C-alpha cells in the first residue's frame, strides 16, 4: 500500500488512480481557499447604508433654510460609509457561503443541451467558499447554505420549468453598454486571473481525470483556476459546462472585486470588478435565450446586478433588476444590491420594497440581516413611514440583546446592539427630538470615542441643530483619527459648504466622485457642491387688497438672478423690482433694475449693487448689504441704500424717495429657539425722518415626526418727525403680537416634501392720538420641496388693523420661488 492509498478511499467511485495521485494539488487548492476565506473577515470593513444621507439631509436642509435664509447657499448632511471603525457594512456586502453541485459519475464530456449541465460553483458574490464536499447536489449555482448544512435533495426540490414569456429569462434585455474600463479590463486579463492563481502542479493528462479535476476546482473555491485550466482543452467539456465554469469564475471575481473596492483607494480598485462585469455581460451573450436556459440566465443576471451596483452603475443595476423581477425568482442577495442602488438613486420606496423582500426571502446566512434592516430603516424614514421605522427598531432591539446569547464567554458584547442604539438616537434626531437624540449619541461616543459612525451621526446632529461650525470642527477632528473614512471626508466637505467655505469643499471633493462613484456620501457631497455652484433664480411676489391707508390694491415682484461662483469667492447678480399700486382713483408704478457683485467667504457675505429706478421719482443709486456669522449662535447683518424700496407708493407718487440704514442682530440657541433685534432709520426727501425698532423671540413648543408647533413673539415701535402727510406717517406707534405657527408635513419622498403651515396672529396696536386697538391676522402657506434644487412656497392671508383710527381689512397672497438653474 502506498502512502496515497488512504486518500483514494475518500474519493468518489468514478475517480481513477491517476486522478487520485494528485493530492498535492488538492492540498494546495484547499490551503489557498482557507487563506482567502480566513483573511476576508480581517480586511473587510463595515459600511452603513447610504440611504441615511437622504434622511438626514432633508431635515438639515429645512432647518438651515428657515434659520439662515442666506440665498444661494445650500446645506446638506452626511452619513457614514465604508471604512470606519465599528461601522456596519452596506447591505450589499454580504458574507455568504456558496455551494455547488457536481456532475454525476457517468457524465459525458461530449456536448449536450444546457439543461443537462451540472451546477457550477456558486456565482453569487460571496466572500467565502464552502469546504470540500463529496459531490453535493444543489438546485442551482446560487443556492446559499451555511457551513455544515447538508445540501437539499434536488429531486425533491427542483421547481418546474416555467413556460410562456417568463421562460425567456433576462436574455431578452437589450445589451448594456460596456464601459471602456470594463472592456479594457476584460482584454487585459482575458488569459489571466486576479489575484493570480498559485502554481499547484501539473494537471492530469487523462481526459476524464482532467475533466473531473477542473470541475472539482470550480466546485471547491478555485473557479478562476478551473477556468484557466479549462481553456487548455475546451473541447473536453460540454458547452454548458464551460458556461457554468465561466459563471463561477466571474462570480468569484465579483467577490474579489468587492473586497478590492474596500481596501484600495487608487484607480486600480476597479480592475477586478470591471473584468467581472465584462465577463458576465459576455457570458449572457453566449448562453442562448431559450426556455431550458432561462433559469441559468436568471442566475447570471442576479450576479450582474450585484456587480453593476458595486461598480457604481446604479441605473444599469436597477434596469437589470426590474427586468429579471418579471421573469423569475430573484435571490435575496440580489434584492439587497438592488435596494442599495435604489437608495443611491433617491427612490426610497423601491429601496424599502427590495430590502423588505430580501429579509423575507433570505435563507439562513444568505444576507447580513442587520445591515439590510438598517437600509430598510432609512428608506422608511425617507418615505415618511415613521411608525414602521420605529416598529422595525423595536424588533431589532428585541432580537439583539446587549450581550451575545449562549456565548462561550459570559458578557460578550453584541456588536449589533451598538448599531441599534445609534439608530435609535438618529431616529430621535430625524423626528424632531434632537436634544434627546444627541444626548444618546454623546453617551455612546463616550463608550466608543473612536467609532467613525458615531462621529458622523453626532456631526449630523449638530447640523440639524443649525450648528455648522461645530459640525465642521467635529469632522475636522475626526479626520485626524479616520483620514481614509469617506463619510468623514465627505461630511467635512458638506459642513464647509454650510459656512460658505467653497474652496475647502472643492478641495475635499476633488476627484472623489471619479474614484468612488459607488459611494453614497461622496455622491451627496457632489450633489451639494453642484447645487451650490449652479446659477440661482430667486423670485418673491406679493399682492394685496385693502383700504386706502397704503393702497387699495398693490402688487410687487422682486427677482434676483445669481451667476455661479467664480474664483471661489464671487458671484455676479442681476436684480429687478417691479410694482404697481392703485389708490384714491390714481395709480403708481415703480421699476428698479440693478446689477452687482457678491463676495463671500467663511461666515461672511457682502453684496454691492448699482441700480436705476424709473418712474415719477426715478434715480440712480446703490445698495450695500453684508452678513457676518462669526459662530453657530450669532448672526449680524446690515444694509445701506440711497433708493429705498420701502418708501410708500403715495409718497413715491409725489416724488419722495428715501435713504435708509438698518441693522439686525440675531442669537440662535438651536433649531428650536432664537431671538433678534432690528433697528432701522430712513431719511425721506421731504425731510421726514423715520426710525423703527423691533424685537422678536421664537420658541418651538411641540414636535413630532410630522408636526411642529411654535410661537413667535414680537414687539416694535416707530416714530416720524413729520405728520399730516399724504402717506401714513404716525408721530409714534407701538405694537405687540404673538403668532402661533403650526407646521404639518404629510408627504415626504427622498429630497421631496410637502409642508403646510398655518399662522395665527393676535396683538394690540397703539397709535399716538388714536389710542389702542386689536389686530389679527391668519395665513395659510404651502411649501413644496420639488427636488433638491427647487422650492416653491405660496400662501394666502387675511388681516385686520387700524390706521389713523380707521379699520382696514387686508387680503393678500404671495408666491416665492427658489430655483438653482
Segments the model singles out, each with a brief description of its role:
Residues 1-47:
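Gram-negative bacterial Sec-dependent N-terminal signal peptides
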Amino acid at each position: 500500500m502506498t502512502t496515497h492509498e488512504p486518500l483514494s478511499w475518500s474519493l468518489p467511485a468514478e475517480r481513477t488512480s491517476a486522478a487520485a495521485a494528485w493530492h498535492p494539488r488538492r492540498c494546495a487548492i484547499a490551503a489557498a481557499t482557507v487563506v482567502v476565506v480566513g483573511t476576508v473577515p480581517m480586511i473587510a470593513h463595515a459600511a452603513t447604508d447610504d440611504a441615511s444621507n437622504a434622511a438626514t439631509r432633508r431635515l438639515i436642509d429645512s432647518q438651515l433654510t428657515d434659520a439662515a435664509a442666506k440665498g444661494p447657499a445650500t446645506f446638506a448632511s452626511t452619513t457614514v460609509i465604508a471604512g470606519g471603525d465599528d461601522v456596519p457594512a452596506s447591505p450589499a456586502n454580504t458574507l455568504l457561503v456558496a455551494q455547488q453541485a457536481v456532475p454525476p459519475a457517468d457524465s459525458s464530456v461530449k456536448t449536450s443541451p444546457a439543461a443537462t449541465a451540472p451546477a457550477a460553483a456558486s456565482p453569487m458574490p460571496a466572500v467565502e467558499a464552502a469546504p470540500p464536499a463529496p459531490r453535493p447536489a444543489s438546485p442551482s449555482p446560487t443556492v446559499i447554505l451555511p457551513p455544515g448544512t447538508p445540501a437539499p435533495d434536488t429531486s425533491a426540490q427542483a421547481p418546474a420549468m416555467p413556460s410562456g414569456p417568463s421562460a425567456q429569462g433576462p436574455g431578452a434585455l437589450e445589451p448594456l453598454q460596456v464601459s471602456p474600463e470594463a472592456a479594457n479590463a476584460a482584454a487585459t486579463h482575458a488569459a489571466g486571473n486576479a489575484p493570480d492563481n498559485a502554481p499547484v502542479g501539473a494537471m492530469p493528462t487523462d481526459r476524464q481525470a482532467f475533466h473531473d479535476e477542473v470541475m472539482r476546482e470550480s466546485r471547491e473555491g478555485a473557479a478562476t483556476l478551473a477556468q484557466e485550466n479549462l481553456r487548455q482543452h475546451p473541447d473536453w467539456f460540454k458547452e454548458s459546462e464551460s458556461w457554468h465554469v465561466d459563471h463561477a469564475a466571474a462570480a468569484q471575481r465579483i467577490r474579489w472585486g468587492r473586497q478590492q473596492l474596500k481596501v484600495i483607494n487608487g484607480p486600480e480598485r476597479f480592475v477586478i470588478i470591471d473584468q467581472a462585469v465584462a465577463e458576465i455581460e459576455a457570458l449572457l451573450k453566449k448562453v442562448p435565450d431559450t426556455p431550458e436556459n432561462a433559469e441559468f440566465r436568471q442566475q447570471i443576471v442576479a450576479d450582474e446586478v450585484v456587480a453593476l451596483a458595486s461598480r457604481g452603475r446604479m441605473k444599469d443595476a436597477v434596469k437589470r433588476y426590474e427586468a429579471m423581477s418579471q421573469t423569475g425568482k430573484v435571490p435575496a442577495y440580489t434584492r439587497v444590491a438592488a435596494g442599495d442602488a435604489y437608495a443611491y438613486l433617491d427612490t426610497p420606496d423601491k429601496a424599502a420594497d427590495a430590502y423588505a423582500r430580501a429579509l423575507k426571502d433570505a435563507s439562513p446566512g444568505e444576507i447580513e440581516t442587520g445591515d439590510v434592516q438598517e437600509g430598510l430603516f432609512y428608506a422608511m424614514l425617507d418615505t415618511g413611514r415613521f411608525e414602521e421605522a420605529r416598529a422595525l427598531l423595536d424588533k431589532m432591539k428585541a432580537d439583539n440583546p446587549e450581550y451575545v446569547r449562549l456565548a462561550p464567554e459570559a458578557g460578550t458584547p453584541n456588536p449589533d446592539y451598538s448599531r441599534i442604539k445609534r439608530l435609535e438616537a438618529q431616529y430621535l434626531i430625524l423626528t424632531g427630538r434632537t436634544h434627546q437624540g444627541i444626548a444618546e449619541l454623546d453617551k455612546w461616543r463616550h463608550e466608543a470615542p473612536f467609532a467613525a459612525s458615531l462621529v458622523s451621526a453626532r456631526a449630523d446632529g449638530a447640523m440639524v441643530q443649525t450648528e455648522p461650525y461645530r459640525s465642521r470642527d467635529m469632522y475636522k477632528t475626526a479626520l485626524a483619527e479616520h483620514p481614509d473614512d469617506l463619510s468623514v471626508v465627505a461630511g467635512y466637505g458638506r459642513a464647509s459648504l454650510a459656512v460658505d467655505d467653497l474652496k475647502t469643499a472643492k478641495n475635499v471633493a476633488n476627484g472623489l466622485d471619479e474614484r468612488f462613484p459607488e459611494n453614497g456620501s461622496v455622491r451627496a457631497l457632489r450633489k451639494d457642491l453642484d447645487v451650490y455652484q449652479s446659477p440661482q433664480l430667486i423670485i418673491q411676489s406679493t399682492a394685496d387688497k385693502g383700504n386706502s391707508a397704503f393702497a387699495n390694491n398693490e402688487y410687487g415682484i422682486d427677482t434676483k438672478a445669481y451667476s455661479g461662483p467664480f474664483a471661489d469667492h464671487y458671484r455676479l447678480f442681476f436684480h429687478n423690482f417691479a410694482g404697481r399700486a392703485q389708490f384714491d382713483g390714481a395709480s403708481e408704478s415703480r421699476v428698479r433694475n440693478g446689477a452687482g457683485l457678491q463676495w463671500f467667504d467663511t461666515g461672511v457675505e457682502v453684496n454691492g449693487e448699482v441700480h436705476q429706478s424709473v418712474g415719477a421719482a426715478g434715480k440712480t443709486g446703490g445698495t450695500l448689504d453684508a452678513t457676518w456669522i462669526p459662530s453657530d449662535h450669532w448672526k449680524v447683518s446690515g444694509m445701506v441704500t440711497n433708493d429705498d424700496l420701502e418708501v410708500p407708493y403715495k409718497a413715491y407718487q409725489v416724488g419722495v424717495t428715501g435713504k435708509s440704514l438698518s441693522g439686525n442682530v440675531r442669537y440662535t440657541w438651536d433649531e428650536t429657539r432664537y431671538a433678534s433685534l432690528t433697528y432701522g432709520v430712513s431719511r425721506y426727501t421731504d425731510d421726514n425722518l423715520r426710525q423703527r425698532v423691533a424685537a422678536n423671540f421664537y420658541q418651538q413648543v411641540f414636535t413630532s415626526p410630522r408636526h411642529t408647533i411654535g410661537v413667535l413673539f414680537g414687539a416694535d415701535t416707530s416714530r416720524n418727525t413729520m405728520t399730516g402727510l399724504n402717506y401714513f406717517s404716525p408721530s409714534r406707534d407701538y405694537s405687540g403680537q404673538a403668532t402661533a405657527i403650526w407646521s404639518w408635513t404629510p408627504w415626504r419622498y427622498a429630497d421631496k416634501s410637502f409642508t403646510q403651515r398655518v399662522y395665527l396672529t393676535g396683538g394690540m396696536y397703539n397709535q399716538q392720538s388714536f389710542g389702542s386697538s386689536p389686530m389679527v391676522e391668519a395665513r395659510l402657506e404651502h411649501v413644496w420641496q420639488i427636488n433638491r434644487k427647487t422650492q416653491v412656497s405660496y400662501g394666502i392671508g387675511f388681516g385686520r388693523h387700524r390706521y389713523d383710527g380707521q379699520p382696514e381689512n387686508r387680503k393678500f397672497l404671495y408666491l416665492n420661488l427658489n430655483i438653482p438653474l
